[in-house]
Design a protein with these regions (language model features):
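Phosphate-binding site recognition
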Residues: 1-425, 440
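Active-site metal-binding core of divalent-cation-utilizing nuclease and nuclease-like domains
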Residues: 139-143, 436-462
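Structural motif
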Residues: 148, 464-466, 500
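Mg2+/Mn2+-dependent nuclease catalytic core
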Residues: 169-173, 472-489
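Metal-dependent nuclease catalytic cores in nucleic-acid-processing enzymes
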Residues: 178-185, 338-346, 434-439, 483-502
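Conserved catalytic cores of phosphodiester-cleaving nucleases, focusing on short active-site segments
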Residues: 433, 455-472, 486
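Domain-level recognition of nuclease-like catalytic cores that cleave nucleotide substrates
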Residues: 491, 497-521
Length: 521
């Protein structure tokens, strides 16, 4: 049985429960200190789903409620002396997804009624904006303290219909109405914190709150949610060591595998390395490294976005966009890239300060393989993603150094899906091979680039390395010649493994591989 280091808060987003029940908590309260020292009044934070936004919102609620006992030993305990108890209204809109007009209005009404009951009065108002205004004023008058408003997942009611104008407009009007009092309530408000995934600029939150601080892409707040590399290798080092022991790995090997699967998020130009907290905590709790975040569901709005912009699976990686692209409201976007970034499927890998452009890539192996598996049925037979089908068969034969058998399997597979290819041209051919070899990366290391050139694919096995070069209506001889002339094998000659080079040709008339050459060095 694995060594138990900590209790992990799997699925727990309530600060009070985590602290009282002794679950692992990575201290983020220094960011609250920062808010207070800078006298920030309105703060907006965008982060992907399941990335810790709700836990931070819950932490803020406990702080402003003066729950001093929950913060013992944390950074803010040394800063805060007064622990003033403010009225806090915490509105969680994550439950307002997939709703029509009447459902959304009822949801808002129920939230407000719950707070009205707590404050002991029944309103005569019907409109949500007037009820919110009365609620804040009533709390201020009763306590003599300014009010804190926390709106978690503010955009949840809108994301699913972002590409459906006839459905988006009425829902947006409802939410615009609900948020509209915030500006006029300024004299009664101590602090307002809003979280979401993207920025709907036409909502009153952004158009009227001139002093709203959007901290989403500020370097100093890059680790406000998620778990930084520093936090993992200091506060959580025993947890990583215990997971490694359970998996038969050293600490260094386990850290490298966690990094490969869950690290890689960057939310600003000089961002810290951030790990996905949902997957990381799940892995530590289960003693198993697996695609937990991606497996928890791909939002329908993301699939619709990819379809709307006809995104090809090969076009997602290493794309550049301007700084201004991140400030575009989703219903006004002309590209899928900003929403892919905001949703956590792409992240910042490089920033060019002269051109003010970001290079976006997949953050890690979990997201890349998950995205490819989601998109692959558009190009491949769905059954090809099963362990017993192409990828599994191909890798098994390579493991046994049966390269001929692997190529025969690949040829038969390509012939079987030829009718699924949309244009049956070189672009389709490239896309299929891109998917096949990248999906192999779910099981082992697949490399495309080297310092001296680019092979189509390099597959690593425990005892062998396989370098593939693929031609379209060319020849296998031409492919082998390119491997030799470009020196694609050179980086692997010192590994002490068997080295195979495979040159293959795809015949567009046969719609499969027509011939190949296999050579072992």
């Amino acid at each position: 049985m694995a060594k138990i280091v900590n209790k992990y808060p799997v699925g727990i987003q309530t600060f009070e429960k985590i602290r009282k029940k002794g679950y692992l908590y990575i201290d983020k309260t220094q960011y609250i200190v920062d808010f207070r020292e800078k006298q920030m009044s309105y703060v907006f934070l965008s982060r992907p789903r399941r990335f810790g936004k709700s836990l931070f919102a819950s932490t803020l609620q406990a702080y402003f409620e003066g729950r001093k006992e929950l913060f013992e030993g944390l950074a803010i305990a040394d800063y805060e002396k007064d622990w003033v108890k403010h009225p806090v209204f915490h509105f969680d809109l994550s439950g307002a997804k997939h709703m029509g007009i009447e459902q959304l209005e009822r949801y808002l009404a129920d939230m407000l009624e719950e707070q009205e009951t707590i404050w002991g009065y029944k309103t005569h108002q019907i409109d949500a904006n007037l009820r919110l205004k009365d609620l804040v004023k009533r709390a201020y008058e009763q306590t003599g303290e300014k009010v804190v408003v926390i709106i978690d997942e503010y955009d949840a009611p809108l994301l699913d219909v972002v590409h459906e104008k006839e459905n988006l407009l009425p829902l947006r009007r409802i939410m615009q109405n609900f948020y509209s009092p915030l500006k006029m309530l300024d004299p009664y408000l101590e602090f307002t914190f809003i979280t979401g995934i993207t920025k709907f600029s036409q909502l009153s939150i952004f158009s009227e709150l001139n002093n709203l601080d959007n901290i989403s892409m500020f370097d100093q707040y890059s680790a406000i949610c998620g778990i930084s590399k520093k936090e993992l290798t200091t506060q959580m080092k025993p947890d990583v060591a215990a997971l490694g022991e359970a998996l038969g790995m050293t600490y260094e090997e386990c850290l490298a595998e966690l990094t490969r699967y869950y690290d890689g998020y960057h939310f600003s130009e000089k961002s810290e390395d951030i790990f996905n907290p949902f997957s990381l905590v799940k892995a530590l709790n289960a003693d198993k490294i697996a695609p937990y975040w991606f497996g928890s569901g791909t939002p329908s709005y993301l699939i619709k976005t990819l379809q709307k912009y006809h995104v090809n699976v090969m076009d997602i990686e290493k794309k550049s966009c301007d700084v201004d692209d991140f400030d575009v409201s989703p219903e006004m976007m002309t590209s899928a890239l900003p929403l892919l970034y905001q949703s956590g499927y792409l992240t910042i890998k490089k920033y060019n300060p002269m051109l003010h452009r970001y290079t976006l890539e997949y953050p890690n192996r979990e997201v890349k393989i998950g995205m490819l598996k989601s998109l692959a049925p558009n190009y491949l037979s769905p059954i090809s993603l099963d362990n017993n089908s192409l990828v599994g068969d191909f890798l098994e034969k390579l493991y046994d150094a049966d390269v001929e058998g692997a190529m025969v399997r690949l040829k038969a597979y390509l012939a079987s899906i030829s009718n699924r290819l949309s244009n049956k041209n070189e672009r389709d051919f490239q896309t299929v091979f891109y998917l096949i070899f990248n999906l192999m990366g779910a099981y082992m290391k697949v490399e495309e680039d080297s310092a001296i050139g680019r092979a189509d694919a390099v597959v690593y096995m425990p005892d062998a390395v396989f370098v593939f070069e693929l031609k379209y209506d060319g020849s296998a001889e031409e492919a082998i010649r390119q491997i030799d002339e470009k020196g694609y094998l050179i980086p692997y000659t010192a590994d002490g493994k068997r080295l195979f080079k495979i040159g293959a040709n795809y015949d567009s008339t046969q719609r499969t591989i027509s011939n190949w050459i296999i050579k072992e060095e």
